[in-house]
Every structure is written in structure tokens, then in C-alpha cells.
């Protein structure tokens, strides 16, 4: 008996401790700072609420039935031959079907509305940032500003940002949790992602796909500046850097595998560097396909250069 009381007390203590510890957690997905993130949170909470319509009654009934039909309750109705109830059948089938239908319609609409490659409707002209996943760092190119950075980006708040994403190594995943969707980065291909920050701040960016021993340190900072003037100042700071990215040799030097990299800025970036990074894998594919049968080689060749805008995932 004492052991049972001890275990019960320990269980309540563990529950309380877990609640206190979890209260200190800062969930980026549930505290978004961008329009896409807000809409995704709304979808998550709506789906969660709908599922509770089934879960909560099921839990209550499980507890209630166990209490009502406990061995010590001599007043409980005993029905050993009970096997069917039209009312019960109607409830257990109708409610889940209605929930599934509602979720199906909701998911269909939001999936298309939050399509990552779909440009955001906004009065401000979008900022274009080209993203290259490396081992194990993030390389960012600003084609309009003529600069590049490692593990840091900046853009004005309340201004759409178009991310063009590829990889210089294995498949990876580009993700700024507080702003919204993640997108895959794949060598020789380009994926597109559109995000916006509703307020100024510095947000954590991560790699959401395991890519090797340096994966855990593959993080970056996304700075949403208060206005365009602050963004221009950040650009000017990058342009003052003595580091340059004038050719592919300089790019390959930066792309050398390394872990826990510091922020770097580059001025005088080679034009069309992003396209060249994609192109070097496409050329490699051509040479590799030369050993394949002619028909198979032609099929692969026809796929080269495709924009994977519709191959990404939004979640």
C-alpha cells in the first residue's frame, strides 16, 4: 500500500515538474513573426482543435466507463448480451467522417494558398536572396546588391523576400521557423520560397535535414531591419568587406567543408554565380549519363535545367 502511494505521489510530482519545464520552452512555430508562419499556426491549431473533438470525449468515456463499471459498483447495469446501438454507430461514424471532410477541404485550400513558390501579394518590391547550402554553412548571394554573406542575411521588415535555393553538396533543407515554410535545397536544381517578416527582429535559421557531422552547427541569423534605410546600411557594411567572390575558385574555397562557421561578408560578387553553382552539377550529370543507354540518357537530358518550384514541401 505504501509503495502504491509513493508511486502516485511520484507521478504527480513528475507531471508538475514536466509542466514547469515545458512552460519555459519557446516554440517558434507557435510564436511566428511572419504572415506565412501565422497562417500555418492557424492551420495547426485548427486541426488540433478538430482532433480534440474526438480525443477528449474518448478520454472522458474511458475514465467514466472504468469508474461506472468498477467491481465495487453493484448498481451498474449488467448487459452481457449487448452488441449493437444505432445511436452509438451514428455518432462514432458520422463525427469522424465530418471532421475528415472538413480537414480535407481545409488542407486543400491552405496547401495551395501557402504554396512556397507562390509570390506574396504586397505593395513593396521583393528582396531577392539566392541561397546555397554547403558543408556545413549557408552561403547567401544578393544579386541586386552585388554582395554575398555566410550565415547571415538581412531584409527590411514588411517586405517580401524571394529565396532561390540550391545546394553545393548533399540535399538539405532551408528553414526560418518564425517566418514560415521550410524548403529543400538540391544540387543542380532550384527551389523557390517566399516569406515576409511582419516585425523587425533577429530570427534563427537552421538546416532542417541531417547532412553530415557538421549539421548541428549549420545555423544562420535572419535580420529583419526596421526599415529600408537600416537594410541599406547593412548592405554598405557588407560592401566594405575586403573579401571578394569574383570567380568560382573563390567560391570553391569558401565551399570547403567546415563546421561552426562565423559570419562573413563578400563584396564584388561574380555575376550569375548562383546559376554557375547549379550549372556545374548539370554538366556533371551530362558526363555521367554518357555511359547510359541512349534512350535513358535522352530522358535525363530532358530533365536538366528544370526549376523545382513545384517539387518542394511547405511544411
Language-model regions: role of each:
Residues 1-27:
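N-terminal secretory/membrane targeting signals
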Residues 10-13, 44, 49, 90:
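Hydrophobic alpha-helical transmembrane segments
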Residues 16-20, 52, 56, 93, ...:
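Alpha-helical transmembrane spans of integral membrane proteins, capturing the lipid-embedded, hydrophobic core
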Residues 17-22, 45, 51, 83:
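Generic secretory/membrane-interface signal
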Residues 20, 61-64, 106-109:
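Transmembrane alpha-helix boundary/anchor motif
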Residues 26-43, 68-315:
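Non-transmembrane, membrane-proximal soluble domains of secreted or membrane proteins
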Residues 40-57:
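Alpha-helical transmembrane segments
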Residues 57-72:
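Membrane-water interface of transmembrane alpha-helices
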Amino acid at each position: 500500500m505504501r509503495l502504491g502511494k509513493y508511486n502516485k505521489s511520484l507521478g504527480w510530482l513528475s507531471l508538475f515538474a514536466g509542466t514547469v519545464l515545458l512552460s519555459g520552452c519557446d516554440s517558434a512555430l507557435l510564436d511566428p513573426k511572419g504572415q506565412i508562419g501565422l497562417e500555418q499556426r492557424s492551420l495547426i491549431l485548427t486541426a488540433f482543435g478538430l482532433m480534440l473533438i474526438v480525443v477528449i470525449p474518448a478520454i472522458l468515456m474511458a475514465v467514466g466507463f472504468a469508474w461506472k463499471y468498477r467491481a465495487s459498483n453493484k448498481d451498474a447495469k449488467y448487459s452481457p448480451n449487448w452488441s449493437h446501438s444505432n445511436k452509438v454507430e451514428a455518432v462514432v461514424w458520422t463525427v469522424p467522417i465530418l471532421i475528415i471532410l472538413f480537414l480535407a477541404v481545409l488542407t486543400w485550400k491552405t496547401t495551395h494558398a501557402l504554396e512556397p513558390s507562390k509570390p506574396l501579394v504586397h505593395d513593396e518590391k521583393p528582396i531577392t536572396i539566392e541561397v546555397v547550402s554547403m558543408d556545413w554553412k549557408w552561403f547567401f548571394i544578393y544579386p541586386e546588391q552585388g554582395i554575398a554573406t555566410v550565415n547571415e542575411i538581412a531584409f527590411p521588415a514588411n517586405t517580401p523576400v524571394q529565396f532561390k535555393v540550391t545546394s553545393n553538396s548533399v540535399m538539405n533543407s532551408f528553414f526560418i521557423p518564425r517566418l514560415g515554410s521550410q524548403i529543400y535545397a538540391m544540387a543542380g536544381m532550384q527551389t523557390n520560397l517566399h516569406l515576409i517578416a511582419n516585425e523587425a527582429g533577429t530570427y534563427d535559421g537552421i538546416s532542417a535535414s541531417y547532412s553530415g557531422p557538421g549539421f548541428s552547427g549549420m545555423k544562420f541569423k535572419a535580420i529583419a531591419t526596421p526599415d529600408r534605410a537600416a537594410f541599406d546600411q547593412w548592405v554598405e557594411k557588407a560592401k566594405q568587406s575586403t573579401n571578394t567572390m569574383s570567380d568560382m575558385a573563390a567560391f570553391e574555397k569558401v565551399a570547403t567543408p567546415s563546421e561552426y562557421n562565423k559570419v562573413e561578408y563578400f563584396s564584388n560578387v561574380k555575376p550569375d554565380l548562383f546559376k554557375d553553382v547549379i550549372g556545374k552539377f548539370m554538366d556533371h550529370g551530362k558526363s555521367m549519363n554518357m555511359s547510359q543507354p541512349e534512350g535513358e540518357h535522352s530522358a535525363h537530358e530532358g530533365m536538366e535545367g528544370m526549376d523545382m518550384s513545384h517539387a518542394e514541401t511547405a511544411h
